[in-house]
Amino acid sequence: MRGLDYRWIEALDSVVSKGSFERAAEQLFISQSAVSQRIKQLEKYLAQPVLIREQPPRPTLVGKKLLGLYRRVCLIEQELVPELTNQEHVRPVSMSIATNADSLATWLLPALDKVMKSRQVELNLVIYGESRTLDKLKNGEVVGAISLEPQPITGCSAEYLGQMEYLCVASPEFYQKYFAKGVTPRSLIKAPAVSYDQYDELHNKFLWDYFAVLRDKVINHTVGSSEAFVRLALSGAAYCLIPRLQIISELESGALINMTPDFMLSYPIFWHHWQLETGVLLEISDAITAYAKSVLPQ
């Protein structure tokens, strides 16, 4: 019986990553019909579909598992072949990491700095909410993810990194305008706030846990940028929850004030990654774990 042909999965990967059969054909230097034929052969071999044929095409659950397998094999190949053939000039190892915006804006880039400077590596940092990054790892789209989930998924490891601490802050002028009589449920309902996106549960949790206020009762801007949170707070346009690490100088200078010194939101984060014990991924895992533990409260 003929085994699984990785050219079939390569075609699937190209269609999904490029978003169409046409662009996949251009990437693989074959005809569009050849791409389609390879995917049909893969589906015939597995006796089930691997691709949802819509625009853009999406992998089925089985397709996602195959892509995860294929990308692991590609990563191992990228590191092993140059070593076996003594190649001096090789293409950089390419890998994707899923991270929340706040980790990227505070500690993640310094953690990766040494590896990025010393190794031939191309990193694709995919930004998602910390409650959803693990889905990218489950689907095989990334090699590692910063997540709230402590339990590793099958074939992966998880390391505790530390606590992300959030402060509720605003400019002095904003505070005087909306909270001169204190931070209360009534004043919070009147004051504009900021959330990252519709999946951002951080602000919802803060409002409900400490003040029993529901999100739909407040004025809430949506801005998909951690840096924009700081700028909005500094400008006096809104108050928001921001990582303590991101605003140390602003707090020290008085440009921002901690609105609720008695309340601080804190949650643990974890680094999930494929179980590869050598190579660049191991270096990245060691760098992320060591740096995070040096700057995040444990």
UniProtKB/Swiss-Prot annotation:
Gene Ontology MF annotations: DNA binding; DNA-binding transcription factor activity
UniProt cross-references to InterPro entries, sorted A to Z: ArgP, ArgP_gammaproteobact, LTTR, LysR_subst-bd, Tscrpt_reg_HTH_LysR, WH-like_DNA-bd_sf, WH_DNA-bd_sf
Alphabetized Gene3D superfamilies for the sequence: 3.40.190.290, Winged helix-like DNA-binding domain superfamily/Winged helix DNA-binding domain
Keyword DNA-binding in annotation: yes
UniProt keyword annotations, A-Z: DNA-binding, Transcription, Transcription regulation
Top-level division of the source organism's lineage: Bacteria
Pfam family, one: HTH_1
Domain HTH lysR-type residues, every copy: 4-60
DNA-binding region coordinates: 21-40
Assembly description: Homodimer.
Biological role: Controls the transcription of genes involved in arginine and lysine metabolism.
Family membership noted in the UniProt record: Belongs to the LysR transcriptional regulatory family.
Protein name as catalogued: HTH-type transcriptional regulator ArgP
Name of the encoding gene: argP
